[in-house]
From Swiss-Prot:
Protein name: Hydroxyacylglutathione hydrolase
Organism: Aeromonas salmonicida (strain A449)
SMART domains per UniProt: Lactamase_B
Reactions catalysed, as given in the entry: an S-(2-hydroxyacyl)glutathione + H2O = a 2-hydroxy carboxylate + glutathione + H(+)
The keyword ATP-binding appears for this protein: no
């Protein structure tokens, strides 16, 4: 039995604990403080740290956590630079096994060159690649890379639960509404998430099958999305990759 525990950090980050009995893994600990507080409150032993990419708000707590738990294993992306840490660096197709839980590593370049995601047991820990209602900015990769990465994640089973690293859902959905104002799934999702946030509750995890209905970055082949992107770009777009590139540029200034 595995339980995922939400640990809010900074302004809008989420750090995830995967718990099994009195042991746990932590995903993208940008800040050690709230993680250590939660581990102490629940009397949990930290067995391993999983990193999706090298940005500071995802790795900033690693040193302090390893100081408190020196036997914890560190895992991270092979193709993202982590010069300050020694760990096991993972590539596409690698696998982590922990207390019967198998997590497959998926290389998802776009946000960074080496970004990876972890998938298994119906869970997807995807860092800053796929957000609920949106996707990450392109700091290092190309639009074509990010589109391909999102397509790989979108091919996972419908009931996959998405544990991304930021609470961006409402702003993502407002952009989605600008792209597809007649999409009832977007309208309904805005209402649902607004209520959750008013109660101080996270919008995550999100179900992948639902994301396909309202996340415009997963809907680039839809005529309604293509039409809006062409209207914004003032030109015809030949394929879903071109549509994605326009959407990502549009979202950057939305």
């Amino acid at each position: 039995m595995y339980t995922v525990i939400t640990v809010p950090a900074f302004t809008d980050n989420y750090i995830w604990l995967i718990r099994h009995e009195n042991h746990c893994l932590v995903v993208d600990p940008g800040d050690a403080g709230p993680v250590l507080d939660r581990l102490a409150a629940l009397d949990l032993q930290l067995d391993a740290i999983l990193l999706t990419h090298h940005h500071q708000d995802h790795v900033g707590g690693v040193t302090a956590l390893l100081k408190h738990f020196p036997h914890a294993r560190l895992y991270g992306p092979k193709h993202d630079p982590m010069p300050d840490h020694h760990g096991q660096w993972l590539d596409d197709g690698d696998q982590i096994n922990w207390h019967g839980l198998s997590l497959d590593v998926i290389h998802v370049p776009g946000h960074t060159h080496g970004h990876i995601a972890y998938h298994g047991h119906g869970m997807l820990f995807c860092g800053d690649t796929l957000f609920s209602g949106g996707c990450g900015r392109l700091f290092e990769g190309t639009p074509a890379q990010m589109h391909d990465s999102l397509q790989r994640l979108a091919a996972l089973p419908d009931d996959t639960l998405i544990y991304c690293a930021h609470e961006y859902t409402l702003s993502n959905l407002r952009f989605a509404y600008a792209v597809e104002p007649d999409n009832k799934a977007i309208q309904q999702r805005i209402g649902m998430i607004s209520k959750l946030r008013q109660q101080g509750l996270p919008s995550l995890p999100s179900r992948l099958g639902d994301e396909r209905d309202f996340n415009v970055f997963l809907r680039c082949e839809q005529d309604s999305v293509k039409f809006s992107a062409e209207k914004y770009a003032l030109k015809c777009l030949e394929n879903p990759e071109d549509t994605f590139a326009v959407l990502r540029s549009w979202k950057d200034v939305f």
